[in-house]
Amino acid sequence: MISTDPWAGAVQDIIAAGRRMDRFGWVPATAGNISRRLPDGRIAITRSGGHKGHLTADGVIEVTADGRAVRAGDRPSAETLLHCHVYEASPDVGAVLHGHSVASTVLSMMEQGDAILLSGYEVLKVFEGQQTHDTTVRLPVFDNDQDIARLSGVVAPYLGRMPAGYVIRGHGVYVWGGTMDVALARLEGLEFLLACELERRKVAR
């Protein structure tokens, strides 16, 4: 049953997204984060350390717009700030997803430049503003950094120019959308494209 309570609805969305991402192998072990913006501007986000394929309501916590836990004792993921910056940059964004797939991890390690270029694929049209396969979408690659505040500062200036999201080298992707369904569709599209690109590079070797 779909809940009319904003918090309960957000929790349901996050749990369902975690199960879907786990089915595809995008959130191994306790990797990944899932969040949804609440009507009051706060954020529902997965608790640090939980397996996203086995989430319960207790695995979702509430944080402020700048990433501080609302309830004493709750421990947000260290990467919560990266979600917060996406919401801050884009008022229309309602959900943010972070996954650790094999394709995104390997391709970002192979890529020597600052972006993975995706060209000629029909599925590029899953991204906002893309009307044709005959185009190139740039997926920015940022070097990994355990200092999340510093990494957030590097990523933030580019957030308005990322139709496909971005990838952290050797780490994983960040994708978002106006709703959880849109964010999941974009993540699925991006992961398909990255898997195709990885296969192409294997064949070309």
From Swiss-Prot:
Pathway the protein acts in: Amino-acid biosynthesis; L-methionine biosynthesis via salvage pathway; L-methionine from S-methyl-5-thio-alpha-D-ribose 1-phosphate: step 2/6
Keywords attached to this entry: Amino-acid biosynthesis, Lyase, Metal-binding, Methionine biosynthesis, Zinc
Pfam families attached to this UniProt entry: Aldolase_II
Cofactors, names only: Zn(2+)
Claim: ATP-binding is one of the keywords in the record: no
GO cellular component, one term: cytosol
InterPro entries in alphabetical order: Aldolase_class_II_sugar_metab, Aldolase_II/adducin_N, Aldolase_II/adducin_N_sf, MethylthioRu-1-P_deHdtase_MtnB
BP terms from Gene Ontology: L-methionine salvage from methylthioadenosine; pentose catabolic process
GO molecular function annotation: aldehyde-lyase activity; methylthioribulose 1-phosphate dehydratase activity; zinc ion binding
Enzyme class: lyase
EC numbers on record: 4.2.1.109
Entry's cofactor comment: Binds 1 zinc ion per subunit.
Catalysis performed (reactions): 5-(methylsulfanyl)-D-ribulose 1-phosphate = 5-methylsulfanyl-2,3-dioxopentyl phosphate + H2O
Binding site for Zn(2+): 98, 100
Keyword Ligase belongs to the record: no
Domain of life where this protein originates: Bacteria
General function of this protein: Catalyzes the dehydration of methylthioribulose-1-phosphate (MTRu-1-P) into 2,3-diketo-5-methylthiopentyl-1-phosphate (DK-MTP-1-P).
Family, similarity comment: Belongs to the aldolase class II family. MtnB subfamily.
Protein name: Methylthioribulose-1-phosphate dehydratase
Name of the gene: mtnB
